[in-house]
Amino acid sequence: MGQASSHSENDLFISHLKESLKVRRIRVRKKDLVSFFSFIFKTCPWFPQEGSIDSRVWGRVGDCLNDYYRVFGPETIPITTFNYYNLIRDVLTNQSDSPDIQRLCKEGHKILISHSRPPSRQAPVTITTSEKASSRPPSRAPSTCPSVAIDIGSHDTGQSSLYPNLATLTDPPIQSPHSRAHTPPQHLPLLANSKTLHNSGSQDDQLNPADQADLEEAAAQYNNPDWPQLTNTPALPPFRPPSYVSTAVPPVAVAAPVLHAPTSGVPGSPTAPNLPGVALAKPSGPIDETVSLLDGVKTLVTKLSDLALLPPAGVMAFPVTRSQGQVSSNTTGRASPHPDTHTIPEEEEADSGESDSEDDEEESSEPTEPTYTHSYKRLNLKTIEKIKTAVANYGPTAPFTVALVESLSERWLTPSDWFFLSRAALSGGDNILWKSEYEDISKQFAERTRVRPPPKDGPLKIPGASPYQNNDKQAQFPPGLLTQIQSAGLKAWKRLPQKGAATTSLAKIRQGPDESYSDFVSRLQETADRLFGSGESESSFVKHLAYENANPACQSAIRPFRQKELSTMSPLLWYCSAHAVGLAIGAALQNLAPAQLLEPRPAFAIIVTNPAIFQETAPKKIQPPTQLPTQPNAPQASLIKNLGPTTKCPRCKKGFHWASECRSRLDINGQPIIKQGNLNRGQPQGPTTGMNSGASQFTPQYRQPTPALPVINHAATSQTSGEQQRAVQDWTSVPPPTQY
């Protein structure tokens, strides 16, 4: 009987401690607390003898744990020992700070001390045969207090008891802590001062069998939760919640010692069926004190129970914990999906034995799986109409169309919504292509999801296969799975072919002669995104094609950067922003020598657009042109136009220039150059009459005066030239013209 009562008291104490820790949002298991206190009893055998748990006694327990840690090492102490010790110390410290709790605890402590007794080591006193016959077997009713218990000792002379008769009890002297350490350990805690109960030889304490039966029934009803309140309970001042208590405090029950129950003479004594396995020993104290003790303890329990408030179920989105509440079913516009099967569930430890039955019941009532909330809206026909118009005008893979689809996918579209959108907006061929791509990507996502345990029906949920083809079931998917569905739908949409463009390979995309380099790179990257995915537009293969498939002008401009490791293609676009700029840069780099590139330019220069205006006043000797090397991309027309004649001028024989452009007046020998032809010749005139009527005189053909000839040495001339010198012609007689 005693072991069953002790077991129930331990369970009640552990449950109260769990409730106290739950107020501070700390959840512990019952078996962990049991193992913790088992280790405490092993380390501190004096701890059960104290009879109560307060900050002073708990501090001594901490000192013992520290000594045990220093002597035996950390491997002999469980990991969670000091954690539980600190939590219980905080509970005791915070409760001692509240004046109301202190007042209530002081009143209850006075009641318990006044009706308790100190431990005794004296031998039990023998009793007479009549007393033995009238007594019942010793037993203890189950108590709700794990720290204080009073049991009536056995009257059997042949058997020793831990609790001797009250007649032999005396007040033990107060022992010091040093002397207490050498005393043998006691098994159950007891309280001091038993003078009020010490009445060994009085016959007034003996009860008749009828009163004893009523007393047993009343004491057995103490632990009954249906026991009504007593009418003569003393009133206590109202209790104010302490400052450290949160907004919701769970019910806290206070344990009381098992003492003597009232007799049948007490008015208002309740009657209830006896509990199994519970019996009371023969009372040895006054009836009035027993009744008053029970009234005071019941009042204390009632006052503390009235302070209990059930905590509201708080709902937290992230992080997901075991204490998260369920979402209310009356929430409108919300979907409460099933837990994500792609996440690793929490492994629950199996509890075995009677000590874990209560813990399993409490954990079964709490949600062990996280609850997700997300907003789901059905597709709007106006939005589908916009996407259909964009697909018809620009194509399914146009930037504007893809932007509309991406904005629509933020509404957590289900697989049924994606299939409906593809069937309504795309053409027949594009719809089939999208479905095949979506199923392929869904299988890839299901294979990449490597979790333990494997996801339940993961390959069936993403494509919306049976039994998840219903849209209502798909709306209950967790956000993680809906995100994978969104990614698969967008990726399959971007792989559709462009509008009006034949499907070609990536290597056949080349830059046109008049196409800008940026447009060529844009076409190349769009095709790479459609074929390989969004992450392959900046790959090394695409960069290689951007150089090899460019036109010759852009290749010459970006050739110095070919061997460099470029993270992006921005430097290539800077040097080839347009085809004309790239051609000019390539031509300039080919025609200029390295020495000319490094030659410093003058600070001031005169730019002459027409150098022919200076040739009359300052003729310049023109050197024959040198043979220039032919370049493949050099402008040959401009070079041929600037080249002069390869022979000297036939008119002046001084330089290499054309005769039509010669401006010299003297030839190489110093002789004046006579202009040939009638460039400056005027109209012919008629003859004039003079004194000689038979002669006609005509005006000379040249209006300009004949220049004075220099004096020439005819002898020298004749020697050098065998030709005879011509004389100056005078007037000439000619016949008159036939007509005027």
From Swiss-Prot:
Gene name of this polypeptide: gag
Site (Cleavage) residue list: 163-164, 318-319, 648-649
Composition skew (Polar residues), residue ranges: 117-132, 193-206, 323-334, 677-704, 715-732
Composition skew (Acidic residues), residue ranges: 346-366
One Pfam family, short name: zf-CCHC_5
Record's keyword annotation contains Lipoprotein: yes
A biological process from GO: viral translational frameshifting
Region annotation Disordered: where it falls in the sequence: 115-208, 323-376, 446-469, 673-740
Name of the protein described by the UniProt record: Gag polyprotein
SUPFAM superfamilies attached to this UniProt entry: Retroviral matrix proteins, Retrovirus capsid dimerization domain-like, Retrovirus capsid protein, N-terminal core domain, Retrovirus zinc finger-like domains
GO cellular-component term (any): viral nucleocapsid
InterPro entries in alphabetical order: B_retro_matrix, B_retro_matrix_sf, Gag_p24_C, Primate_lentivir_Gag_pol-like, Retrov_capsid_C, Retrov_capsid_N, Retrovr_matrix, Znf_CCHC_sf
Gene Ontology molecular functions: nucleic acid binding; structural constituent of virion; zinc ion binding
Function noted in UniProt: Matrix protein p10: Matrix protein. Nucleocapsid protein p14: Nucleocapsid protein.
Lipidated sites in chain (N-myristoyl glycine): 2
Basic and acidic residues bias locations: 446-459
Motif stretch (PTAP/PSAP motif): 396-399
Sorted UniProt keywords: Capsid protein, Host-virus interaction, Lipoprotein, Myristate, Phosphoprotein, Repeat, Viral budding, Viral budding via the host ESCRT complexes, Viral matrix protein, Viral nucleoprotein, Viral release from host cell, Virion
